Regions:
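Mixed-charge (Asp/Glu-Lys/Arg
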Residues: 1-13, 19-136
C-alpha cells in the first residue's frame, strides 16, 4: 500500500491490518469495511456496520477506517477516515445510527460526491494523508 509494509494481526482486537513505515517505525491500524451497492435514482448507496465499542476505544494509535463499495463489478474509491474524526461525526453531527452495539453508517454516492447521514464526506475520498507514498 503506497510502499508501506502490511501485516495481519495474530489476535483479533478489531483491526484488519497493521501498516508500517519501516524507515521510521510509523505504525497505522486499519479496519477495512466492505459493502455491495444499492442502486438509487442519482447514484448508489451502501451501508456499513462499525462496533460502537471499537469506535469509542481511542488509543494512542488511532484506527483508520477504510470503506469500500462494490458497484457494477468495480470497487469504489476508498473513503479513508481516522477513528477520532468518525467518532466526532457520530457524536456531534448525528452521522450514523446506533443499533445492537453497532453504528450503521449509510453512505450515498452521486457523481463524485459522497454523503453520510447528509454530511459531506467528499474530503475523505482517497484521503491518503496519513499514508504518504514511500519511495524505496
Amino acid at each position: 500500500m503506497l510502499g508501506w509494509n502490511v501485516a495481519i494481526p495474530e489476535v483479533d482486537i478489531g483491526d484488519d491490518i497493521f501498516v508500517v513505515q519501516d524507515d521510521n517505525g510509523t505504525l497505522r491500524r486499519v479496519q477495512v469495511k466492505t459493502s455491495t451497492s444499492t442502486l438509487r435514482k442519482d447514484g448508489f448507496s451502501a451501508q456499513f456496520n462499525v462496533s460502537v465499542k471499537n469506535l469509542r476505544n481511542i488509543s494512542n494509535i488511532l484506527v483508520h477506517y477504510i470503506f469500500l463499495v462494490r458497484h457494477n463489478d468495480e470497487w469504489s474509491n476508498p473513503i479513508i477516515i481516522r477513528q477520532d474524526y468518525l467518532l466526532d461525526h457520530f457524536e456531534n453531527n448525528n452521522v450514523g445510527s446506533e443499533s445492537k452495539g453497532n453504528i450503521i453508517f449509510y453512505f450515498s454516492y452521486t457523481n463524485s460526491n459522497v454523503e453520510c447521514s447528509g454530511q459531506d464526506f467528499k474530503t475523505y475520498i482517497k484521503n491518503f494523508t496519513d499514508f504518504p507514498k514511500i519511495k524505496h
